[in-house]
Amino acid sequence: MKFVDEAFIDIAAGDGGSGCVSFSHEKYKEFGGPNGGDGGRGGHVYAVADVNLNTLVDFRFSRRHEARNGQHGMGSDMFGAKGDDIILKMPVGTILTDAETGEVLFELLVPGEQVLIAKGGDGGFGNLRFKSSTNRAPRSKTPGWPGERKNLKLELKVLADVGLLGMPNAGKSTFISAVSNARPRIADYPFTTLHPNLGVVRVGPEQSFVVADLPGLIEGASEGAGLGHLFLRHLQRTRLLLHIVDLAPFDEGVDPVAQAKAIVRELKKYDEALYEKPRWLVLNKLDMVDADKRAAIVKDFVKRFKFKGPVFEISALTREGCEHLIKTIYQHVKQVQKSEQPVEEVDPRFVPLPPESPETP
C-alpha cells in the first residue's frame, strides 16, 4: 500500500569567508610584502539515502538546515578554515524538487547514495593574490561568495508498515489521530473513513513507522459488501495487522466477539496468506468501561474469541495504553525489516578464521 509522504525544507549552504589584507612585519625588514590569506569555503549541504529510514516525519519538526560559513583569511599567509558540511539523512526513494519551480533536482534511489544539494560559497581572495610586478603592496581583497539557498519539496512513496483492521466505528480513526500526524474525519457513525488514511508515528529521532487507517469492514466485505475488497487488498503488503475492537458499543445488543469473528472470517475468505499475517488484538474504548469490570470483560472476550496472539488494552480517546503499544509495534517492525534485508554474500577466501584455542598442557 503506497501513499505519498511529503515535507518542505529550507536549506542554506555556508557563505565563503572574506580575504584578508595583511603585510609581513619582520625585524630589520622595512617593507614586508603582502601575506593576507584567502577566506575558507562555506559548508556544503548533502543528502544521503539511509536504508534505516522510511518516512519524512523528522523534516516536519526541523524545517531549516544551515551549513557553517567559512572563516575569514588571516595574515602570515593563513587561509580561513572551511565551514562544516551537513548531511541530511533521507529514506531511499526520496525525490527532491525545487519548491518554487517544480523542477526535480535529485532522486535518492540507491542505499548510501550521497548527493550535493547546496554548494558552499568559495572564499574570497586575500591581498597576496593581487601582488604583481607593478603592484608590490596591494590593498585589495574580495569578499566570500554566498552559499546556495534553496526551498525544497521532499516526496516519498511510502509503504504502510501497519494496517488497522476492524468494524466501522471501532475507533481506528481516533487511534491513528492519537498516535500520528494524520487527521482523518471522525464521527459516531459507520463508514466515516471513506478512503485510506496514512499516519506517520514518530517514536523518536529517526525512529518512525507508517500506519494505515482503512475503511471499516462488515460481513461480506470479501465479496465486495460495504466498501468491499477494494481496501482489503491494501492490507496484503503490510508487516503487521492491528485488529481493533470496540469493547463498549453503543448498541447493547451488539456482541463485540461476534463482530471480531466476522472480521477474521472475511480475512480468511479473501486471502489465506492475509489471514496468516501477524495480527495483534487491540481492545479499544476502555475509558467507557467501569474500572472494576475491565479485567473480567477483557478476560471473557479473549476466552470467547479464542485469540492466542498479543493482546493490548487501550483507550484511543485518552491515549491510555497507546505509548506502550506503539513502542512494541516499532520493535516488531524493525525486526521484520531486518529479516527482509538480503544476506550479504561473503567471499570464502576472506572469511576470518576462528581464534585458536589455547593448547592445554
UniProtKB/Swiss-Prot annotation:
UniProt biased composition (Pro residues): 351-361
GO BP annotations, alphabetical order: ribosome biogenesis
GO MF annotations, alphabetized: GTP binding; GTPase activity; magnesium ion binding
Pfam families with a match to the protein in the record: GTP1_OBG, MMR_HSR1
Residue ranges annotated for the OBG-type G domain, each copy included: 160-334
Primary subcellular site in the record, as a coarse category: cytoplasm
PROSITE patterns reported for this sequence: G_OBG, GTP1_OBG, OBG
Cell compartment(s), UniProt: Cytoplasm
Function as written in the Swiss-Prot or TrEMBL entry: An essential GTPase which binds GTP, GDP and possibly (p)ppGpp with moderate affinity, with high nucleotide exchange rates and a fairly low GTP hydrolysis rate. Plays a role in control of the cell cycle, stress response, ribosome biogenesis and in those bacteria that undergo differentiation, in morphogenesis control.
Family affiliation: Belongs to the TRAFAC class OBG-HflX-like GTPase superfamily. OBG GTPase family.
Family annotation (NCBIfam families): Obg_CgtA (TIGR02729), PRK12296.1 (NF008954), PRK12297.1 (NF008955), PRK12299.1 (NF008956), small_GTP (TIGR00231)
Protein name: GTPase Obg
